[in-house]
Design a protein with these regions (language model features):
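Sec-dependent N-terminal signal peptides
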Residues: 4-15
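N-terminal "mature-domain start" segment
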Residues: 18-45, 143-148
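Short secondary-structure junctions
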Residues: 29-39, 76-88
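Surface-exposed amphipathic alpha-helical segments
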Residues: 30-33, 125-152
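Short, surface-exposed coil-to-beta transition loops
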Residues: 39-42, 53-55, 101-110, 119-120
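A short acidic-to-branched-hydrophobic micro-motif
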Residues: 44-71, 119-126
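Signature of long, low-cysteine stretches enriched in small and polar/charged residues
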Residues: 78-116
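Short, exposed beta-strand-loop hairpins at the edges of beta-sheets
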Residues: 97-101, 111-139
Length: 152
C-alpha cells in the first residue's frame, strides 16, 4: 500500500547526472533511500520502512513561502486521497489525508522555515494507521532532522 501511495504522489522523470550542489547524495543513499528525481530544482527520494513509506522532495521555488507550498501540495493530491485536516505543529505545516482506495493515512509536512533560501522540503509520510498527536510530532521531528541533515 505504501508504495502505491508514494507512486501516486511522485512524478517520475528521467535522472540527470548532476545532483543539486546543496544535496549530500551519498548520505541519502547510505540511509537506504532510493533517489527518484535528480534535477537542479526538483530532487526526490523515497524509502519504505516497517512503520511507514516516506517520500521526500526538495523543491527550489522562488517568490513563495512554506505555507503556500503546503497549500499547493494539498491542492494537487490525487482523488484517492481525502483531505481530513491541517494539523497545528510547531515545526511544520502538516496536512492529513485518508486513502479512500487502500486504507491508511498520509501526512504531508513542510517545514515552516527553510534551511536553504528558496529550497522547500515536502515530506509524505504514509502509514497504515492513524497517528496520535504525540506520534505525529515525533515523526515530524525525526524525519525533518534526518532530511535537513542531507542539505549542505
Amino acid at each position: 500500500m505504501k508504495k502505491i501511495i508514494l507512486g501516486l504522489f511522485l512524478i517520475l522523470g528521467t535522472l540527470s547526472f548532476a545532483s543539486p550542489s546543496f544535496v549530500d547524495v551519498n548520505k541519502i543513499k547510505q540511509n537506504s533511500y532510493e533517489i527518484r528525481d535528480d534535477e537542479d530544482d526538483f530532487f526526490t527520494f523515497v524509502k519504505s520502512t516497517d512503520e511507514a513509506g516516506i517520500s521526500v522532495a526538495f523543491n527550489v521555488i522562488e517568490d513563495t513561502n512554506s505555507k503556500e507550498v503546503s497549500e499547493m501540495i494539498k491542492s494537487i493530491a490525487p482523488d484517492s486521497q481525502k483531505f481530513l485536516s491541517s494539523i497545528n505543529n510547531k515545526r511544520a505545516y502538516v496536512n492529513k489525508f485518508a486513502d479512500n482506495e487502500n486504507g491508511g493515512f498520509t501526512y504531508n509536512f513542510v517545514p515552516k522555515t527553510e534551511k536553504i533560501k528558496n529550497c522547500y522540503i515536502s515530506v509524505l509520510y504514509v502509514t497504515d494507521s492513524e497517528l496520535s498527536s504525540t506520534e505525529l510530532d515525533n515523526a515530524v521531528n525525526k524525519i525533518l532532522n534526518e532530511v535537513e541533515s542531507y542539505l549542505k
